[in-house]
Structure formats: C-alpha cells, structure tokens
Design a protein with these regions (language model features):
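Parallel beta-helix/beta-solenoid
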Residues: 34, 53-54, 61, 79-80, ...
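Extracellular beta-strand solenoids
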Residues: 41, 52, 60, 66-68, ...
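Bacterial N-terminal signal peptides
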Residues: 5-13
Length: 406
C-alpha cells in the first residue's frame, strides 16, 4: 500500500475515534468538589445530566459547555446556598410533560448568573424554590412556533425569588404560577408568546423590564396586589395582543410604564369587590390600536396622570356597563377639544368620550372586521353631525391635562 494512502487511512481512523468519544462526565467533577468548595473546570464540553446536591460554586468562566445530549434536563440544583455561573448549557430533551430544562432549581438561596442557555426546551425552572437569584443569564428555547417552545423561566410554588437583568429571546413565556412575592426586574424579553404571565401569584413586582415583539406583554390572572412599574412594552400587534392585561386581580398598581404599538395597550375587567381597584397612573399609552379596553365594566378603577396619544381608539368598552364610574382625572388626551385660558395646564372643560358608530363593532363582534372602514367612518361622521340617537358616554375626565407630560 502506498505511504500516502496509509496516512489517509490512519487520519480517518483518528477522526472517527474522536467523533465517537463521548464528552467527559460533569457529574464526576461535581462529586469530587468538597462542600463549600469551588469547581473551575477546564474549558471544554462536558456531558449532562448533572445533579448538585451540596452547597458549592461552579464557575465555568464562559468557556465550559454542559451538553444534555437531547435527553431530559441538563443541570439539577437540588441544594441550597450554591452558585452556578459562567456555564453554557444546551441540548435538553423535548418533553413538555417532564419539563426538560437547562437548569432545574429545587433548593433555596442559590445564585444562577451569567450563564448562556441555548437549544433548551425550558430555560430555568424553579419548583418549590425560595429566595433564589437568577441574574444576567441569556436564554433561548428550541427553534419552533411560540406555543411549542418551553418557558424561558418558569416559577412554580416558589416565593421571594429575584429574576434580574436576564436577556430572554424566542421562548414561550416567563411563567409565575402559585408563587407570591417574586420580583422580576430589568429583564429584556423578545419574540415570546406571553412575555410574562402571573397566575395565582400575588404581591409580584414587575419593574424596569423591556418587552418587545411578543404576542402579549404582561398578564395578571388572579394575582392581587401586584406592582407593574417603569416597563417599556412595545410592538405586540397580533389580533389578540395586549400590552398589559389585568384579569380577576385587585389592588394592582400600573404606573410609569410606556406601552406603545400594541393592539390593545391595557385590558382590564371589573374587580370582584369595590375595594379591589386597578390604579393606573403616569403611564404613556400611545400609538396603539386601542389605548385601554374594559370588559364587563362596573367601575372602581383609579386612572390618573396618564398620557393617551395617537391611539386609533382611546378607550373601548365591551360587554355591559361603561367606563364613566371609574375615577378619571388629570390625564392627557391628544384629541381633547378645549382651551386653557388661565394657563394652569388643566383644560377649561372636561374631556368627554362618546361612542357613536363605534357602538356597532363594540356590541357586535362580527362587525369588528369593518372597524375604521370607510362605511363606518362615514356613519360615525353622520352620527356626530346629526345623531340618530343619543350617543353613549364612555368616560369623563374632569381635569384633563392641556399639555403632554414630559
């Protein structure tokens, strides 16, 4: 055999052997680390799954990859007081039933920070885990339609966790379920289904997040006493998209947010009890198809100091009732038709919003297809010019701002 042919055969054998060699086990390194110790593995790819069952620190320095091999979850944090940072975690299984996740946390007071999670069905799953910090992680799910992905972060039956400054892209949701007193702050979430949904999770703080190009921004369902503050929610423009939806939740504060370019800016239903109010103040609600939408409105909400700008419809009401029983005061309306003769920045007359031809598509769902069509626009013009019947008043703001808040 010619020498060059022998060399080719040898090289091919080496390449095949290298491909067939599985990555080393990460579990062995974890097991060899003492309680309270620090594991700094050599750069490279290691095989999961791995279970951490003692307080310790794992620091991958951004150069250590933990690969799940496409089966199950990758890293189980079944302890308290541990730190996991600087890892690249990838290739979970595909099971929604088993909640295959890059990191599953079932202990308290852990830190998970500065990790990269990719090609993982669920990103970080906290189950019966309290007072953990999840910070500065970059998370993406499997490449699939939004509803077929897993949650970027999922919190179940867990309290007082902090989810801070994470970059989350192309996941299904960030879900908080049966979990009170959690804080979700400073995160960026893009191209998800529900950027955040809270279900039976009272006393949540949602602050200073950037939510863009998601089907829906923030949803509260049966989650009382939440604070939604200082977030920017934009470009949720599908038919059913909403910036902030508050359903069956009372004593909720929505303040200082910017909600722009959404199908519906804010959606809410009526509180069960009069004392369970929605407080909406100092928000900018602009360039939405509908600024604010009520369903089954009975009043009781406090809506002060907001700026309603360039919305196709400022406020709409579906179902029974109207929005006049809410406390509207000091809001800026860009379609206000009045003066400010004493220059106190308060309009000389109240802002009043009426429904003319809009009543057709508000009361008849099938007619919503024709919303803002030339026919309905002409009918609306004629109704305003010479009403066929008394229009419905949707709201009255007794002290509208004359200039837009800065």
């Amino acid at each position: 055999m010619k020498p060059w042919l022998v060399c080719l055969v040898v090289l091919a054998s080496w390449a095949q052997a290298a491909q067939a060699t599985p990555p080393p086990s990460f579990q062995a390194l974890v097991d060899a680390t003492p309680i309270g110790g620090t594991l700094r593995p050599a750069p490279g790819i290691y095989a999961g799954p791995t279970t951490v069952n003692k307080p310790m620190t794992i620091d991958g320095g951004g150069k250590v990859t933990l690969d799940g091999g496409g089966t199950g979850s990758v890293l189980f944090l079944a302890t308290s007081g541990a730190t996991v940072r600087g890892l690249i975690l990838q290739n979970t299984g595909q099971s929604h039933d088993r909640l295959d996740a890059a990191i599953t946390i079932s202990g308290d007071d852990n830190r998970v920070e500065n990790n990269v999670i990719t090609n993982s069905l669920f990103g970080i799953h906290l189950r019966q885990a309290n007072r953990n910090l999840v910070k500065h992680n970059r998370i993406s799910s499997k490449h699939a339609e939004a509803s077929l992905r897993g949650d970027g972060i999922r919190i179940w039956n867990s309290v007082e966790n902090r989810i801070e400054d994470n970059d989350i892209n192309e996941v299904r949701d960030l879900t908080v379920m049966n979990s009170p007193r959690n804080r979700v702050t400073g995160n960026s979430i893009r191209n998800a289904r529900y950027a955040m949904q809270f279900v039976f999770s009272p006393h949540a703080l949602v602050e200073n997040n950037s939510l863009s190009s998601n089907i829906t921004g923030i949803v509260l369902l049966n989650s009382d006493s939440a604070i939604i503050r200082g977030n920017r929610i934009s470009h949720s423009m599908e038919t059913s998209s909403v910036g902030v939806a508050v359903k069956k939740s009372g004593e909720v504060i929505v303040e200082g947010n910017e909600i722009v370019h959404c199908a519906v800016g804010v959606l809410t239903d009526s509180p069960f009890n009069p004392e369970e109010k929605l407080i909406l103040r100092n928000n900018r609600i602009a360039h939405n198809t509908t600024g604010m939408q009520f369903y089954g409105e009975r009043g009781g909400h406090i809506i002060h100091g907001n700026s309603f700008e360039k919305n196709l419809s400022q406020v709409v009401v579906f179902g029974s009732g109207n929005a006049t029983d809410n406390d509207w005061r000091g809001n800026y309306w860009d379609d206000y038709q009045g003066f400010d003769r004493n220059q106190d920045n308060i309009g000389d007359k109240p802002y009043e919003l009426y429904a003319y031809a809009d009543r057709i598509w508000m009361e008849t769902p099938m007619a919503r297809f024709f919303r803002n069509s030339p026919v309905l626009e002409l009918l609306d013009f004629l109704e305003r010019l010479a009403p066929f019947s008394a229009p419905d008043m949707l709201l009255r703001d007794q002290a509208p701002l004359f200039h837009r808040p800065k």
